Amino acid sequence: MAVMDPWLLITIIVGFGMAWAIGANDAANSMSTAVGAKAITPKQAVLIAGVLEFTGAYFFGKSVTETIRKGILYPDRITDPTVLIYGSVAALLAATIWLVIATKFGLPVSTTHSIIGGIVGYGIVYAGFSIVNWGKMTQVVLSWILSPIIGAIMAFLVFKALTKSIFERKDPVRSSKIWSPFWIGLAFVVIGTMFYIKVLHGKSLKTGVLFYGIPAGLVVFLILFLTLRVKFPSSDPFIGVESIFRRVQVITSGYVALAHGANDVANAIGPVAAVYAVATMGMAGMKVPVPRWILAMGGLGIAIGVATYGYRVMETVGKKITELTNTRGFTIDFSAATVVLVASWLGLPISTTHVVVGAVIGVGLARGVKAINKDIVRDIIISWFVTVPVAALISAFLFKILMIVG
């Protein structure tokens, strides 16, 4: 299998490029609300995100990954290892090209949808439309529609409830001493549960809630409740409440970065692991082992992507859609995490990127339609709908060339 070695090197380079693009676009979402709400500076954001994305990818990334993401193609139709190699390179390169274009314009798009588009493109060229699992593709299309709508509704309702429980009371300071710990504690129930499922890859929601979520939520609630009874951050209730949520927002955003690294690194390393398995062991199955160095490569690529080019998407999500404060940023993080957790439990097709952007829109709508930058929202929605077809077309073209010259 020595003849495969050059293709392994090519795939590693392209996979690293894909990881970089994921960091520049998708990973930037994790810190966008914290930057937009001025909880942290852009420089602090890229440093925190870079470290946590790498940590999530290397230490918590799955040791076994799918060669064909989300079962989007029927694996029994691809028996030739060469096709898998050429297809992996074409899909990775196509997804990378599209992500770089989207990032250039500051458009947050789904990296999962990008790689799915790349896989569909080479699959159709190789074996026709019958190779595509159209049931799975229907789920992908549904996620375009469901994710932002559910995210927006959730954020709208949470923000309305939060403001009513604190800011609209006769004594906001007194109310915030009770309700701030409640909302933040509730958020940590979700974060603790998500840590078990998304980072530790646990299977039981009940175990996650009982042994991770509730203990984390109770500890945070008690610490905040007792602290605020001793000293409130400011005599001005609005400044005081925003100060409380500012500190929490750094933690919630950091968690999102950690979980993103653990999960979405597979979009970059899955095809690399597939080619590595073929080149070194002659394996060409649906699932393949992932060496630690490939996880490290993916994590490093994502971290560098956030640090060098993540500011464009951060600016769009954090500043251009609507004006954010710390309570609004917290609402977005909490709502997005809750929606993703429930969707994972129910098996619903959900895009985290779309949920986050939908939540930003929902928080803006809670203040009225005029609080939303409709031009930016329009551009983002268009970019979502063209992601799969554009990535598919680029991949089809590249795969055809590789099959001819390879």
From Swiss-Prot:
One of its GO terms (cellular component) is plasma membrane. Pfam families: PHO4. One of its GO terms (biological process) is phosphate ion transmembrane transport. Belongs to the inorganic phosphate transporter (PiT) (TC 2.A.20) family. This is Putative phosphate permease TK2061. It is found in: Cell membrane. GO terms for molecular function: phosphate transmembrane transporter activity. Potential transporter for phosphate. It is a multi-pass membrane protein. The chain crosses the membrane at residues 2-22, 45-65, 82-102, 115-135, 139-159, 182-202, 208-228, 288-308, 324-346, 385-405. Keywords: Cell membrane, Membrane, Phosphate transport, Transmembrane, Transmembrane helix, Transport. The keyword Metal-binding does not apply. The keyword Transmembrane helix applies.
